[in-house]
Amino acid sequence: MYKAFLFFILWYNQRLFVTSLSQNSPSLKEIKICTVMDQAGYTPVSALGEFRLIDRMTEKFSSYHEQVVRGIGDDAAVVKTADGMVDVISTDLLVEKVHFDLSYVPLKLLGYKSVIVNLSDVVAMNAHPYGITVSVGVSNRFPVEALDELYAGIHQACQQYKVNLLGGDTTSSKVGLVISITAIGRSKEEKIVYRSGAQKNDLICVSGDLGGAYAGYLVLERERRVLLDKPELQPD
């Protein structure tokens, strides 16, 4: 009896689902299923670059809420809050073999960096970051201890900058390690600094060693190539 009832529920839900698809989905003639890489006349993403691609993907989107002061187009979005302040929201995605190489990047350092690159966007808008969400896609080649190391770096960054971990998501991945972090900050609306606010003769101040990170990257890449060619040189 129970199995028959369960089958009926599944059958009925499937009917509702198919009906919904037929009423709300485009017709098959409107759906193009193709492998883009095999088709002539398509534009490669590299031909546009990051910002032109973002403009193209988002040009049809509108703002439906008056509390959204600034959406796409700056370091972070700006949203009014009930207390007269604004929340500043930014997100970044880090993908293995694109943004980092685990052959020379320690997981703890990667966790720390993944937080910092998001907090920097909030700070660039002259807001004070107070929270982050962390979403991780991880393949089965990573043991629990590896994730412990990753989150140790995330925890270190949260401690250093007094930022709360607000939540996130964890899922499996077939392409290695993927990290997505959203950072949220707060400021007075009149204190927000936009990219468009830069003026001629403004003073630009920087800290640290300009080009130091890139120089270090070149050294690490050189050493990685050497070890691939001569694995016997790998240190104990």
For the regions a protein language model found, what residue spans apply to each?
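Serine residues within intrinsically disordered or low-complexity segments
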Residues: 20-27
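Helix-biased detector of long, well-ordered alpha-helical tracts
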Residues: 16, 30-236
